[in-house]
Regions:
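Helix-to-loop junction immediately C-terminal to a conserved catalytic motif
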Residues: 50
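Conserved ABC transporter NBD signature motif
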Residues: 58-73
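ABC ATPase nucleotide-binding domain "signature" region
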Residues: 33, 47, 137-142
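Conserved ABC ATPase signature
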Residues: 128-135
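Conserved ABC ATPase "signature" region
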Residues: 95, 99, 107-124
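A short, flexible loop at the N-terminus of ABC-type nucleotide-binding domains that lies
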Residues: 1-4, 8-21, 28
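Walker A (P-loop) phosphate-binding loop of ABC-type ATPase nucleotide-binding domains
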Residues: 37-41
Length: 142
């Protein structure tokens, strides 16, 4: 279960309020969406959960535990903006992502090869990211 209590986040030295006393409970096994206009704080909240940025105030709990770095491995996040390096090969990009997640290069290689085999996309390994469609690039981020 995800529980957020009175989460607030500001930018520009407090001049821009992204979230103000935001609270939500998401029961285990459920699917929720965050809806709202631009600037409503949806992305800020997702980034706080993923520990990309920190809340100014409030608390977040995952299964009753205060949010901590150990939760990162259990949280998925695919940002709308692309975090891909177009001149890298698909394989190199995935190894880089694995290292960002704390995996050894060998373990990242093993996992990437496993999933390439499962998804039958072995032929993508040496392709440049710039050669992929937006949809295919999104799969690489996943």
């Amino acid at each position: 279960m995800l529980k957020a209590k009175n989460v607030s986040k500001t930018y520009n030295a407090g001049k821009k309020i992204a979230l103000q006393d935001f609270s939500i409970e998401v029961p285990t096994g459920s699917v929720y969406g965050l809806l709202g206009p631009n600037g409503a704080g949806k992305t800020s909240f997702i980034r706080i959960i993923n520990q990309i940025t920190q809340a100014d105030t409030g608390e977040i709990f995952i299964n009753g535990e205060k949010l901590n770095p150990n939760h990162i491995k259990d949280i998925g996040y695919m940002p709308e903006e692309r975090g891909l390096y177009k001149n890298m090969t698909v394989g190199d990009q995935l190894l880089y992502f694995g290292e960002l997640k704390g995996m050894s290069k060998n373990h990242a290689l093993e996992q990437a090869k496993y999933w390439f085999d499962q998804l039958e996309i072995d032929h993508w390994w040496k392709k440049k990211l710039s050669e992929l469609s937006k949809g295919m690039a999104q799969k690489i981020q996943f």
